[in-house]
C-alpha cells in the first residue's frame, strides 16, 4: 500500500515523535541539540533500531539502552526477518482471523484481534513473530555487523544488564553453565566500539544488587528500574537503607549522563 514504509510502523511512530520533539522542544524551554533517547527491554531494542536509522542521526545526542539488546547475535528467540517473511506471517494471521484482505482486517475490532492474538500463541509467540523487519527502508542492515565494521557512529551510550535475565543453558545446567545473552551482546558491542576507535564515551553497567524477598528472586529482568527511577518505596519488597543509597547514586548517574554525556558529570577528572 505504501512502499516507502512497508513495515516497522511502531518504529516509524517513534521516529515521528522524536522528530516532533526536535522541532518543537525549544518552545518549551528545551534544547533540540541535547536530546537523549532511552529505553528498557523492548524499548532498549527500539533505541538500537532508532540509532541505526540514518534520518535520526542529527537529532540524537545520547542514548540509554537498559537490558535491550534483543537485536543481537546471541538472542535467537528474536530473529531478524525479511519483508517477504514478515508478509507471509501476516497473511497466515489474516487467515487465522478469517479475513481475506487488508480492508476486511481493518474492520476487525480490537477485542477480536486481541482474542485471536491470544489464541495464535500470545506473547511467547508474538515476541518471536512481530518484531522489527529488515524492510530495506527503516531497517537496512544488521546493527551489530555495522558497528563491528565501523560503518555506523554510535553516540555516547549508557547501557547495561542484570545478571539473572535471559539466561540460557543446556537442560539441567547449573548456574555456572548459564549464559546471559544480553551480557554477551553488550560486551560484543562495547568491544567493537573500542576496536573501531569510536570517539564517544560509552558506559557499561552490571546491576548486581541483592534483592530481598521470600521468593529469593535474584536480579531479574526490569528490577533495576526501581533503582534508576527511585521508586523503591512503591514496592512491597523489604528494601533497606543501602538499597536507597544505591538507588540515589544510580539516578544521579542517569541524570548526569543525560545532561552531560558522562555518568560522573562535568566535574569528573577521569
How would you name each of these model-derived features?
Residues 3-27, 82-94:
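Alpha/beta-hydrolase active-site loop
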Residues 3-8, 73-81, 143-144, 171-180, ...:
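Active-site rim elements
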Residues 12-19, 45, 84-88, 183-187, ...:
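A structural signal for well-ordered alpha-helical segments within the folded catalytic domains
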Residues 21, 28-41:
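Alpha/beta-hydrolase fold nucleophile elbow
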Residues 23, 52, 57, 62, ...:
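Substrate-access "cap/lid" subdomains that shape
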Residues 32, 59-60, 202:
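Core-facing hydrophobic residues within beta-strands of well-ordered domains
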Residues 39-49:
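Glycine-rich nucleophile elbow surrounding the catalytic serine of serine-hydrolase chemistry
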Residues 164, 187, 191-270:
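Mobile gating loops/cap/lid regions near enzyme active sites that modulate substrate access
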Amino acid at each position: 500500500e505504501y512502499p516507502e514504509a512497508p513495515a516497522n510502523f511502531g518504529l516509524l511512530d517513534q521516529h515521528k515523535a522524536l522528530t516532533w520533539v526536535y522541532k518543537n522542544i525549544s518552545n518549551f524551554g528545551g534544547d533540540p541539540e541535547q536530546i537523549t533517547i532511552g529505553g528498557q527491554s523492548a524499548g532498549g531494542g527500539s533505541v538500537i533500531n532508532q540509532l541505526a536509522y540514518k534520518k535520526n542521526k542529527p537529532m540524537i545526542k545520547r542514548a540509554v539502552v537498559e537490558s535491550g539488546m534483543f537485536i543481537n547475535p546471541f538472542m535467537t528467540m528474536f530473529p531478524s526477518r525479511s519483508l517477504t517473511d514478515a508478509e507471509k506471517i501476516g497473511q497466515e494471521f489474516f487467515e487465522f482471523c478469517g479475513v481475506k484482505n487488508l480492508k476486511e482486517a481493518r474492520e476487525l475490532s480490537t477485542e477480536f484481534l486481541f482474542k485471536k492474538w491470544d489464541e495464535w500463541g500470545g506473547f511467547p509467540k508474538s515476541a518471536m513473530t512481530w518484531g522489527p523487519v529488515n524492510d530495506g527502508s527503516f531497517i537496512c542492515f544488521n546493527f551489530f555487523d555495522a558497528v563491528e565494521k565501523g560503518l555506523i557512529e554510535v553516540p555516547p551510550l549508557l547501557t547495561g544488564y542484570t545478571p539473572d535475565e535471559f539466561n540460557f543453558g543446556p537442560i539441567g545446567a547449573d548456574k555456572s553453565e548459564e549464559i546471559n545473552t544480553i551480557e554477551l551482546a553488550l560486551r560484543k558491542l562495547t568491544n567493537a566500539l573500542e576496536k573501531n576507535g569510536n570517539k564517544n564515551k560509552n558506559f557499561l553497567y552490571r546491576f548486581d544488587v541483592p534483592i530481598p524477598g521470600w521468593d529469593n528472586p535474584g536480579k531479574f529482568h526490569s528490577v533495576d528500574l526501581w533503582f534508576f527511577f527511585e521508586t523503591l518505596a512503591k514496592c512491597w519488597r523489604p528494601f533497606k537503607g543501602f538499597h536507597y543509597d544505591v538507588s540515589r547514586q544510580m539516578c544521579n548517574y542517569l541524570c548526569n549522563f543525560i545532561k552531560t554525556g558522562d555518568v560522573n558529570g562535568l566535574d569528573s577528572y577521569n
